[in-house]
Amino acid sequence: MIIIFLGPPGAGKGTQGKKIAKKIHLPHIAIGDIFRAIIKTSSKDAEVINSYVEQGKLIPDEIVNHIIKNFLSSSDYKKGYILDGYPRNLEQAKFFESFVTEKIKVIYLNVSDELLIKRILGRYSCKSCGKIYNDYFLKPRIDKICDVCKSSVFEYRKDDNEEVIKERINIFKTETYPLIQHYKNNDDFYMIDGNKNEEQIEDHIEKVLKIN
């Protein structure tokens, strides 16, 4: 089974995707994490991807498709997986559907622009283990100490500023809304109210996916 999490930046795709992945024992694949790992290398792909990320622009389809197809060719993903951040538009969806045969379920997290901006501006992560926190909604239990690994070193993403965030939201509306309409014809398409709190969103997703 393949589960695709769709939604604008800051919708909580990564948070919810990881939770569901853990409960149903499927690998969680975040295209953003893949790109950030590539950026840390000195490859030509890193230079190309970084130029788009710094401007808050979406990476061209041919680059994204090539990377994701190669990544999914691993035997680790033969039994299914959860995708976070891919596909982002109709062209990517058509490419993806051309080489996968498994049943696809789609979870769309619908969130207001105002809440998205607040979530993203307050977002930071533990530099050691990657645990995500938020200045407004999810601080560590002990101030400046990671709940998971106890590190005291945190980092904000450099592309998380209000101007870039608004541009990313606008790009999402232009590029991804047609994809939402495409998947609405799928019996396994589920729209989730992403304005609710983390636990309420998780409960709703579990209900539609029939996870006990």
Swiss-Prot record:
Pathway: Purine metabolism; AMP biosynthesis via salvage pathway; AMP from ADP: step 1/1. Disulfide bonds: none annotated. It is found in: Cytoplasm. The keyword Lipid biosynthesis does not apply. Keywords: ATP-binding, Cytoplasm, Kinase, Metal-binding, Nucleotide biosynthesis, Nucleotide-binding, Transferase, Zinc. The keyword Phosphoprotein does not apply. It comes from the Bacteria. CDD domains: ADK. InterPro entries: Adenyl_kin_sub, Adenylat/UMP-CMP_kin, Adenylat_kinase_CS, Adenylate_kinase_lid-dom, ADK_active_lid_dom_sf, P-loop_NTPase. GO terms for molecular function: adenylate kinase activity; ATP binding; zinc ion binding. Zn(2+) binds at C126, C129, C146, C149. Residues 122-160 are annotated as: LID. Residues 30-59 are annotated as: NMP. Its main location: cytoplasm. It holds the Pfam family ADK. Its EC number is 2.7.4.3. Belongs to the adenylate kinase family. PANTHER family: NUCLEOTIDE KINASE (PTHR23359). Catalyzes the reversible transfer of the terminal phosphate group between ATP and AMP. Plays an important role in cellular energy homeostasis and in adenine nucleotide metabolism. This is Adenylate kinase. It comes from Rickettsia bellii (strain RML369-C). The lineage of its organism: Bacteria, Pseudomonadati, Pseudomonadota, Alphaproteobacteria, Rickettsiales. The gene is adk.
